[in-house]
């Protein structure tokens, strides 16, 4: 049975050696946008689990949050340390396992993670552990791949041939995510989706060309003069509807303890 293991992530970050954060796609600002829409993080104690590059945690620290980042990949923590020093903010970095957090019950006002829950065949132990360290009334933000997207097909094909970078990964519909939150003792309060810009095909093409022939396409190509404004207007209109959450590549949701 395939699974996502620590060595997959160590290999991922080893491959990223020598890259700066400017070479790694961010999440388009969606995590910060949604957090600031739901709460004011100033003064809050915040934990990011599986922090990766720590970009969002660093931005939250700038906004006045008291931030802790946790990851079990040493290279990830090195990146966060370097970036937080450049930004001139204080971020606490902890090496650890998201299934066994080294914090007492009720330690945090906000816990969040992205690209994490989908790598566990049984997500409930992790969710319950994250709920454990939330204060009463605290918020958990979970950001995961959305089930009904062509990304899912390509991902499962790669997994079938043992070519998926993370070893194994699943996906969720927004309804499934909300049901998981309820089962973990949370009340879902807010959901959102993201279509990914630039799209998956462009990102894959850029990576292939860089690795094979050394061509470095721009990370964010200029939108076409006519199509760009139309596309933005469509996304703004349709993105306000719950039905859009069944078309996006990723979804996220908040649950309150």
Regions found by a protein language model. Give the residues of each.
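A short His-aromatic
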Residues: 115-119
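Acidic carboxylate diad motif detector
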Residues: 142-144
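Short, glycine-/aromatic-enriched active-site segment of Class I SAM-dependent methyltransferases
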Residues: 146-168, 179
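Short alpha-helix
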Residues: 169-185, 191
């Amino acid at each position: 049975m395939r699974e996502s293991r620590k060595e997959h992530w160590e290999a991922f970050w080893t491959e990223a050696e020598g890259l700066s954060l400017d070479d790694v796609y961010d999440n388009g600002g969606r995590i910060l946008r949604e957090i600031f829409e739901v709460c004011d993080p100033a003064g809050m104690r915040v934990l990011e689990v599986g922090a990766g590059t720590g970009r969002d945690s660093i931005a939250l620290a700038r906004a006045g949050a008291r931030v802790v980042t946790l990851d079990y990949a040493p290279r990830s923590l090195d990146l966060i340390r370097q970036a937080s020093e450049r930004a001139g903010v204080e971020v606490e970095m902890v090496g650890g396992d998201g299934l066994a957090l080294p914090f007492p019950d009720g330690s945090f006002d906000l816990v969040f993670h992205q690209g994490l829950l989908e790598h566990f065949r049984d997500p409930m132990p992790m969710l319950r552990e994250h709920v454990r360290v939330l204060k009463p009334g605290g918020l958990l933000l979970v950001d995961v791949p959305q089930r009904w997207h062509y990304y899912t097909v390509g991902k499962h094909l790669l997994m079938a041939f043992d070519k998926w970078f993370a070893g194994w990964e699943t996906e969720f519909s927004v309804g499934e995510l909300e049901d998981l939150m309820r089962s973990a003792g949370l009340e879902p309060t807010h959901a959102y989706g993201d279509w990914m810009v630039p799209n998956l095909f462009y990102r894959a093409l850029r990576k292939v060309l860089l690795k094979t022939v050394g061509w470095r396409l721009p990370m964010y190509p200029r939108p076409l003069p006519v199509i760009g404004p139309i596309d933005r207007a469509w996304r703004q209109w349709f993105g306000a509807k719950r039905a859009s959450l069944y078309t996006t590549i990723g979804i996220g949701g908040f649950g309150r303890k």
